Amino acid sequence: MKKIVFLILGLAAFAFGADGEMIRSYSVIAGGIGLGLAALGGAIGMGNTAAATISGTARNPGVGSKLMTTMFIALAMIEAQVIYALVITLIVLYANPMLG
């Protein structure tokens, strides 16, 4: 797996011949990996939040509505982190500050 990653990163420079294009190609790779990791972390966090809410509601059905409200607030905060990663990726891809 490491050999494939190094091969892709090494050949990206030759695939895009110009100097500015090399930075842009690495930005695309980094943006894709970063956004994928952010989405993965967000999905794991949302799954854990939903599991904890369902478990709490099963233990004490009387507080189910309060737990649901808290869960929705937590899900919004988790999703906000993924949206921040998307915004940073879009900035790096379209208004790349490294290109000057």
Swiss-Prot record:
Membrane topology label: Multi-pass membrane protein
Organism of derivation: Campylobacter concisus (strain 13826)
Assembly mode: F-type ATPases have 2 components, F(1) - the catalytic core - and F(0) - the membrane proton channel. F(1) has five subunits: alpha(3), beta(3), gamma(1), delta(1), epsilon(1). F(0) has three main subunits: a(1), b(2) and c(10-14). The alpha and beta chains form an alternating ring which encloses part of the gamma chain. F(1) is attached to F(0) by a central stalk formed by the gamma and epsilon chains, while a peripheral stalk is formed by the delta and b chains.
Keyword presence, Transport: yes
Classification of source organism: Bacteria, Pseudomonadati, Campylobacterota, Epsilonproteobacteria, Campylobacterales
Disulfide-bond pairs as recorded: none
Protein role: F(1)F(0) ATP synthase produces ATP from ADP in the presence of a proton or sodium gradient. F-type ATPases consist of two structural domains, F(1) containing the extramembraneous catalytic core and F(0) containing the membrane proton channel, linked together by a central stalk and a peripheral stalk. During catalysis, ATP synthesis in the catalytic domain of F(1) is coupled via a rotary mechanism of the central stalk subunits to proton translocation. Key component of the F(0) channel; it plays a direct role in translocation across the membrane. A homomeric c-ring of between 10-14 subunits forms the central stalk rotor element with the F(1) delta and epsilon subunits.
GO molecular function, one term: proton-transporting ATP synthase activity, rotational mechanism
Keywords assigned by UniProt, alphabetized: ATP synthesis, Cell inner membrane, Cell membrane, CF(0), Hydrogen ion transport, Ion transport, Lipid-binding, Membrane, Transmembrane, Transmembrane helix, Transport
Compartment list: Cell inner membrane
Family, similarity comment: Belongs to the ATPase C chain family.
Site (Reversibly protonated during proton transport): E79
First and last residue of the signal peptide: none
Designated name of the protein: ATP synthase subunit c
Transmembrane segments: 27-47, 72-92
One GO cellular component term: plasma membrane
Predominant localisation class: membrane
